[in-house]
């Protein structure tokens, strides 16, 4: 692909790290590419609506109610220069819950929340209007996914088609509860952070911090990848890749791809070379020996970076 391709344009201009004055910029870049190339019909387009917590989005209108969902969808359609979105995802739960790696769930009565049907009704109207085609969740729990699926079945409302949650060699917590729901209910995982912010490429080994890398740009925002057990696990996985003469990043991605509950693996890249390397992982084979060795490391260092 030439350097002027959509992937190149997006990776050169994407808003990383995201800030108040850059949110929505990636949609604009993609929208400009659609307008220029007329290739919208060749692309499966997914985007998200932000939940509570970012008060500068839509003037603080972060609830998943009909008004804010309509405003968010219309804003995305305008930036993307299209009249429909294939997959529209709720970025994180509106209710109080454990997501973004949070542990130690503590429930309180004031945290009771039961807007599943209201949200699905609003989504149903958006689907019937033709503005979106399918609905997905992100950073969701097994209970949340199950409740959405239950309500959609009872009320004949749109069904959750996917869940975009983190999954990698360093964070396999999805297997604990959500994997079974994904398989039985055919609501597959779109795995994000499969390379654990780049740690599973080996580029941060020995304390290295490459210029323009995510950890350089984000600073101390993702310290969970720097834990002692996380670093030890990374070294062990790196040893497996070296032993079997595998590219470390490709091995990490392929492991995710092989899981039966995964629909797709979301990759990110800073350069076209990185993008090509990531894509080539689809042609890699992982032997049973490699998979056994990976699982042994998981037993020693279980989910060190949730």
Regions found by a protein language model. Name each.
Residues 1-7, 11:
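Single conserved hydrophobic/aromatic residue that forms the stacking wall/gate
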Residues 5, 65-79, 145-149:
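Short, acidic/polar
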Residues 16-38:
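Aromatic-lined substrate-binding rim segments of carbohydrate-active enzymes
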Residues 16-18, 53-58, 97-98:
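A short acidic, helix-capping loop that chelates divalent metal ions and anchors anionic groups
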Residues 23-28, 62-72:
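Glycine-rich anion/phosphate-binding loops
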Residues 33-44, 79-81, 127, 149-155:
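Acidic (Asp/Glu)-rich catalytic clusters
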Residues 55-67, 107-114:
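Active-site mouth loops of central-metabolism enzymes
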Residues 93-296:
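Beta/alpha (TIM)-barrel catalytic core signal, keyed to glycine-rich beta->alpha loops juxtaposed to Asp/Glu
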